[in-house]
Amino acid sequence: TAEALALYREGYQPSPEHPEPRTFLTVNVVVAPTQAQAQRLVQPMVRTMVALRTGQPLMPQESVEEAEARGVVAAHQPLADEMASRWVVGDPQQAAARVRELAATFDVDEVMVSPVAGSFAGTPVRRSPAREETLRLLADAM
């Protein structure tokens, strides 16, 4: 990320309308009232991304309960941990602090939040209330 931003900034061609480069960072985010709840809600996306990165077939996203029951195979756990470490997962205060930290670290103008919280069994996967809650809690904490 830092290298890509540096290349963009170094190669930026100013124009009258845009004299300075503008940058943004996209971050996968899961926010819940507690850290433990956020960790549960991120599990379906972790499993989906591990499948994508290891060449497994992509299936419809699992519920939180399905992801917890299946877990991540031991051989893929380091990959899962490495990916999730770059995401923002936590309670509102933790998440807001991490978003601010990332914005400062990469010196970006904007942070684009991609809510990736999973759904519990019986909740429509395509309209995850936890994704809406992620945005609401993060906005309130910012």
Residue spans of the language-model regions?
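An alpha-helical appendage that flanks or caps ligand/catalytic pockets
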Residues: 1-109, 120
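C-terminal helical cap(s) of enzyme catalytic domains, especially alpha/beta-barrels
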Residues: 1-11, 123-142
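Flexible loop residues that form catalytic
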Residues: 116
